[in-house]
Amino acid sequence: KVENILPKGLIAGDKAGILSEEGAKLLDPSGNLEAGIPLCPPEGDAGTGMVATNSVTRKTGNVSAGTSVFAMIVLEKELKKVYDEIDLVTTPSGDLVGMVHCNNCTSDLNAWVNLFKEFAQNFGVEDVDMDQLYGTLYNKALEGDKDCGGLLAYNYFSGEHITGFEEGRPLFVRKPDSNFNLANFMRVHLYTALGA
Protein backbone atom coordinates (compact mmCIF):
# COMPACT_ATOMS: atom_id res chain seq x y z
CA LYS A 1 0.00 0.00 0.00
CA VAL A 2 1.15 3.51 -0.79
CA GLU A 3 0.43 4.55 2.81
CA ASN A 4 3.20 2.23 3.96
CA ILE A 5 5.74 3.83 1.61
CA LEU A 6 5.05 7.53 2.13
CA PRO A 7 5.97 9.30 5.37
CA LYS A 8 3.18 10.37 7.70
CA GLY A 9 1.90 13.89 7.01
CA LEU A 10 2.88 16.38 9.69
CA ILE A 11 1.98 19.95 10.56
CA ALA A 12 4.57 22.74 10.56
CA GLY A 13 6.42 22.72 13.87
CA ASP A 14 5.98 18.99 14.48
CA LYS A 15 9.10 16.94 15.10
CA ALA A 16 9.73 14.70 12.11
CA GLY A 17 12.59 12.69 13.60
CA ILE A 18 16.31 12.88 12.98
CA LEU A 19 18.55 12.13 10.03
CA SER A 20 19.75 8.53 10.27
CA GLU A 21 23.27 7.28 9.47
CA GLU A 22 21.84 5.57 6.38
CA GLY A 23 20.07 8.76 5.27
CA ALA A 24 23.17 10.89 5.79
CA LYS A 25 25.24 8.52 3.62
CA LEU A 26 22.53 8.50 0.95
CA LEU A 27 22.41 12.31 0.81
CA ASP A 28 26.17 12.82 1.10
CA PRO A 29 28.37 9.86 0.12
CA SER A 30 31.47 11.92 1.04
CA GLY A 31 30.57 11.55 4.73
CA ASN A 32 30.59 15.26 5.59
CA LEU A 33 26.88 15.29 6.44
CA GLU A 34 26.41 14.05 9.98
CA ALA A 35 23.54 11.92 11.25
CA GLY A 36 21.34 13.21 14.06
CA ILE A 37 20.20 16.45 12.42
CA PRO A 38 16.60 17.20 13.52
CA LEU A 39 14.05 17.14 10.70
CA CYS A 40 10.85 19.10 10.29
CA PRO A 41 7.99 18.94 7.78
CA PRO A 42 9.13 20.51 4.48
CA GLU A 43 7.81 23.93 3.57
CA GLY A 44 7.66 25.57 0.18
CA ASP A 45 6.93 29.00 -1.23
CA ALA A 46 3.17 28.53 -1.00
CA GLY A 47 3.17 28.09 2.77
CA THR A 48 5.73 30.81 3.17
CA GLY A 49 3.53 33.18 1.17
CA MET A 50 0.53 32.37 3.35
CA VAL A 51 2.47 33.18 6.50
CA ALA A 52 4.16 36.29 5.05
CA THR A 53 0.78 37.78 4.06
CA ASN A 54 -0.96 36.58 7.25
CA SER A 55 -3.37 34.55 5.11
CA VAL A 56 -3.63 31.55 7.39
CA THR A 57 -7.12 31.87 8.86
CA ARG A 58 -10.35 30.82 7.19
CA LYS A 59 -11.75 33.14 4.53
CA THR A 60 -8.36 34.81 3.93
CA GLY A 61 -6.13 34.37 0.93
CA ASN A 62 -3.14 35.55 -1.01
CA VAL A 63 -1.89 35.76 -4.57
CA SER A 64 1.66 34.98 -5.64
CA ALA A 65 2.67 36.33 -9.03
CA GLY A 66 5.86 35.71 -10.96
CA THR A 67 6.61 33.59 -14.00
CA SER A 68 3.54 31.65 -12.86
CA VAL A 69 0.68 32.82 -10.67
CA PHE A 70 -1.45 31.21 -8.02
CA ALA A 71 -4.21 32.21 -5.65
CA MET A 72 -4.65 30.48 -2.31
CA ILE A 73 -7.83 30.78 -0.26
CA VAL A 74 -8.15 29.25 3.21
CA LEU A 75 -11.47 27.43 2.98
CA GLU A 76 -14.33 28.00 5.38
CA LYS A 77 -15.43 24.38 4.91
CA GLU A 78 -14.49 21.36 2.81
CA LEU A 79 -15.47 21.40 -0.85
CA LYS A 80 -18.51 19.25 -1.64
CA LYS A 81 -17.04 17.85 -4.85
CA VAL A 82 -13.80 17.63 -6.81
CA TYR A 83 -12.88 20.55 -9.05
CA ASP A 84 -10.08 19.91 -11.56
CA GLU A 85 -9.18 23.60 -11.41
CA ILE A 86 -8.54 23.59 -7.65
CA ASP A 87 -5.67 21.87 -5.86
CA LEU A 88 -6.16 21.25 -2.17
CA VAL A 89 -3.24 22.03 0.11
CA THR A 90 -3.07 23.15 3.74
CA THR A 91 -1.88 26.08 5.79
CA PRO A 92 1.20 25.43 7.92
CA SER A 93 -1.20 24.67 10.79
CA GLY A 94 -3.24 22.19 8.74
CA ASP A 95 -6.33 24.16 7.61
CA LEU A 96 -7.59 23.29 4.13
CA VAL A 97 -6.64 25.68 1.31
CA GLY A 98 -7.97 25.85 -2.25
CA MET A 99 -5.18 26.73 -4.68
CA VAL A 100 -5.62 27.72 -8.32
CA HIS A 101 -2.35 27.75 -10.25
CA CYS A 102 -1.63 29.05 -13.75
CA ASN A 103 1.65 28.50 -15.57
CA ASN A 104 1.45 31.87 -17.30
CA CYS A 105 2.05 35.20 -15.63
CA THR A 106 5.17 37.25 -16.41
CA SER A 107 7.11 34.97 -18.78
CA ASP A 108 5.98 36.72 -21.97
CA LEU A 109 6.32 40.15 -20.36
CA ASN A 110 9.85 39.23 -19.24
CA ALA A 111 10.70 38.22 -22.81
CA TRP A 112 9.64 41.66 -24.09
CA VAL A 113 11.64 43.43 -21.36
CA ASN A 114 14.68 41.38 -22.34
CA LEU A 115 14.13 42.49 -25.94
CA PHE A 116 14.33 46.12 -24.75
CA LYS A 117 17.50 45.23 -22.84
CA GLU A 118 19.03 43.81 -26.03
CA PHE A 119 17.98 46.95 -27.90
CA ALA A 120 19.74 49.13 -25.29
CA GLN A 121 22.87 46.98 -25.49
CA ASN A 122 22.95 47.43 -29.26
CA PHE A 123 23.09 51.18 -28.62
CA GLY A 124 26.15 50.72 -26.42
CA VAL A 125 24.52 50.44 -22.99
CA GLU A 126 26.50 47.44 -21.77
CA ASP A 127 25.40 47.26 -18.13
CA VAL A 128 21.61 47.56 -18.28
CA ASP A 129 20.13 47.98 -14.79
CA MET A 130 17.18 45.57 -14.94
CA ASP A 131 15.44 47.15 -11.93
CA GLN A 132 15.57 50.52 -13.66
CA LEU A 133 14.45 49.00 -16.97
CA TYR A 134 11.45 47.25 -15.42
CA GLY A 135 10.60 50.35 -13.37
CA THR A 136 10.77 52.63 -16.40
CA LEU A 137 8.61 50.35 -18.54
CA TYR A 138 6.06 49.66 -15.79
CA ASN A 139 5.72 53.36 -15.02
CA LYS A 140 5.33 54.08 -18.74
CA ALA A 141 2.37 51.67 -18.75
CA LEU A 142 0.57 54.04 -16.35
CA GLU A 143 0.43 56.58 -19.20
CA GLY A 144 -1.37 54.14 -21.51
CA ASP A 145 -5.01 54.29 -22.57
CA LYS A 146 -7.49 52.40 -20.40
CA ASP A 147 -8.25 50.11 -23.35
CA CYS A 148 -4.54 49.83 -24.21
CA GLY A 149 -5.16 51.73 -27.43
CA GLY A 150 -6.84 48.75 -29.04
CA LEU A 151 -3.80 46.51 -28.64
CA LEU A 152 -4.38 42.89 -27.69
CA ALA A 153 -1.99 40.38 -26.15
CA TYR A 154 -2.45 36.77 -25.06
CA ASN A 155 0.13 35.73 -22.49
CA TYR A 156 -0.12 32.04 -23.35
CA PHE A 157 3.60 31.27 -23.03
CA SER A 158 3.18 27.80 -21.53
CA GLY A 159 0.48 25.20 -21.77
CA GLU A 160 -2.14 25.04 -19.03
CA HIS A 161 -3.65 21.96 -17.41
CA ILE A 162 -7.13 23.42 -17.55
CA THR A 163 -6.97 24.07 -21.32
CA GLY A 164 -5.49 20.68 -22.12
CA PHE A 165 -2.51 22.07 -24.03
CA GLU A 166 1.07 21.13 -23.19
CA GLU A 167 2.56 24.16 -24.97
CA GLY A 168 1.56 27.77 -25.34
CA ARG A 169 1.84 30.33 -28.12
CA PRO A 170 1.95 33.95 -26.95
CA LEU A 171 0.24 36.38 -29.27
CA PHE A 172 0.32 40.15 -29.77
CA VAL A 173 -2.03 41.77 -32.30
CA ARG A 174 -3.27 45.20 -33.28
CA LYS A 175 -5.44 46.84 -35.88
CA PRO A 176 -3.89 49.28 -38.36
CA ASP A 177 -5.56 52.17 -36.52
CA SER A 178 -4.67 51.05 -32.97
CA ASN A 179 -2.84 53.56 -30.78
CA PHE A 180 0.44 51.66 -30.95
CA ASN A 181 2.93 53.25 -28.57
CA LEU A 182 5.20 52.15 -25.74
CA ALA A 183 2.76 53.04 -22.97
CA ASN A 184 -0.07 50.99 -24.48
CA PHE A 185 2.29 48.15 -25.39
CA MET A 186 3.50 47.81 -21.81
CA ARG A 187 0.02 48.28 -20.37
CA VAL A 188 -1.49 45.50 -22.48
CA HIS A 189 1.31 43.12 -21.49
CA LEU A 190 0.84 43.93 -17.80
CA TYR A 191 -2.90 43.37 -18.18
CA THR A 192 -2.48 40.04 -19.92
CA ALA A 193 0.09 38.84 -17.36
CA LEU A 194 -2.69 38.76 -14.77
CA GLY A 195 -5.83 38.57 -16.82
CA ALA A 196 -5.54 36.46 -19.95
Identify the residue ranges that each predicted region occupies.
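Active-site core segments that coordinate phosphate-bearing ligands/cofactors
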Residues: 1-3, 10-196
